[in-house]
Amino acid sequence: MESIPISVEGFRRLERELERLKKERPGVILAIKEAREEGDLRENAGYEAARERQGMLEARINYIESRMSRFNVIDLATLGGEQVIFGATVEIEDVDTGDVKKYTLLGPDEAEPSKGSISLLSPVGLALLGKFVGDEIVVDAPRGKINYEIVSIAFHGPIAAADD
C-alpha cells in the first residue's frame, strides 16, 4: 500500500471530522427508527432521507478510516529547500499571458484550490514536483497546453486551518 502525504494540520482536521461523524451516528440511527415507526416505508420521505444520510455518513467514515493508516503525516514547519516538494508554496507565471498563480502543494485529502492549495497529484502538482526556480513546466489544460515558469518556491511552515 502506497503512503499518502498529508500535513499535520490536514491530518488533525480529518481526525476531527471523523470524530464528529461518529457522534452523528446515533442521531441518524434514531431518526431511522422513528421514521420506521411511522408506518408504510414505501412513501415515507423521512425514512428515505434518514437512510440516505446514514449511507453518506457511513461511506465518509469508512473512507477516512481506510485512509488514516496510509497517511504519511508531514510537519510543514520542518520543510525547506530550493526544490518543489510536498508543502512548498510555488509561484508560477504563464509564459504567454504573464498571469501569475500561487499554489501550495498538499496531499489529495487536504487540497483546496479555492484557498490556494492543490494536490501534488494534480496535473499542475505533478508537473511542478522536483523543479526549481526558473524551470518551465507544461500543463495540459482544457484550452490546450500552458507553459509556466517557476517564479518562486517558499516554505511557510504550518498552513492556516480551514474552517470545519
Swiss-Prot record:
Domain of life: Bacteria
A GO molecular-function annotation: RNA polymerase binding
InterPro entries the UniProt entry points to: GreA/GreB_C_sf, TF_GreA/GreB_CS, Tscrpt_elong_fac_GreA, Tscrpt_elong_fac_GreA/B, Tscrpt_elong_fac_GreA/B_C, Tscrpt_elong_fac_GreA/B_fam, Tscrpt_elong_fac_GreA/B_N, Tscrpt_elong_fac_GreA/B_N_sf
Entry-linked Gene3D superfamilies: Transcription elongation factor, GreA/GreB, C-terminal domain, Transcription elongation factor, GreA/GreB, N-terminal domain
Coiled-coil region list: 12-38
Gene Ontology biological process terms in this record: DNA-templated transcription elongation; regulation of DNA-templated transcription elongation
Keywords: Coiled coil, DNA-binding, Transcription, Transcription regulation
NCBIfam families: greA, PRK00226.1-2, PRK00226.1-4
Protein role: Necessary for efficient RNA polymerase transcription elongation past template-encoded arresting sites. The arresting sites in DNA have the property of trapping a certain fraction of elongating RNA polymerases that pass through, resulting in locked ternary complexes. Cleavage of the nascent transcript by cleavage factors such as GreA or GreB allows the resumption of elongation from the new 3'terminus. GreA releases sequences of 2 to 3 nucleotides.
PANTHER family: TRANSCRIPTION ELONGATION FACTOR GREA
Family of the protein in this entry: Belongs to the GreA/GreB family.
Protein name: Transcription elongation factor GreA
Gene name of the encoded protein: greA
